[in-house]
Amino acid sequence: MRLFRSLTLLLASLLMTVAAPAAFADDTYQVEMILVRQNAVPAIVSRAAPEDWAAGAQRLGNDSQRTPALNDVVTKLTASGEYTVLMHKAWQQSLGEAPAKVAVSEGQEQFGQFPIEGTLEMKLGRFTDVTADFWVNQIDANGLVTASEHLRQDSHTKNGQLNYLDNGHLALLIKITSLTAPAPREAPEVVPD
């Protein structure tokens, strides 16, 4: 009896050891974001963006960028006249329980600064924790940032859904979709009795 119990405990601990790394392994996700200006809200000009705006963040490489899927949302936002779409990007990256921070930018770089620049930090859990930190910069003829609009927002987002992060004058729409999770099964046409 003791031998059987010992073997059972040994087998259970072995299975937990083998299965545990898979439970905490990073998965591949597609991240898509749309940064907008809300036209009806007065601009809030903040201090100029810091020179080290991307500190600690991984830059998006061309190989990770993907074709955006939310073009219909961009069309509706633009047609409404209530929003100005400033940036629309999509990329693929690994996400897990450890925070992953990426640097995202748009426009011509001048002395390390972009017209639109910022970081997204994401961490998987029950929800995906997102910290968005973006600047929309006014750059003068000498390449110096003279003024910035700033969006800083923390949110718990649901994967696979379009999430709206409101920060007054600027807002961010973000959708994080797993590329490795199994697709949901279709509901049967007829439910058996």
Where are the language model's segments positioned?
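Bacterial N-terminal signal peptides that target proteins for export
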Residues: 1-11
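Charged/polar interaction segments and conserved charged motifs
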Residues: 2, 22-25
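N-terminal signal peptide c-region/cleavage motif recognized by signal peptidases
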Residues: 17-20
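Extended, low-hydrophobicity segments enriched in charged/polar residues
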Residues: 24-156, 160-165, 179, 185
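Polar alpha-helical coiled-coil and adjacent low-complexity
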Residues: 167-169
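Short, low-complexity, Pro/Ser/Thr/Gly-rich segments in the mature regions of secreted, periplasmic
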Residues: 171-193
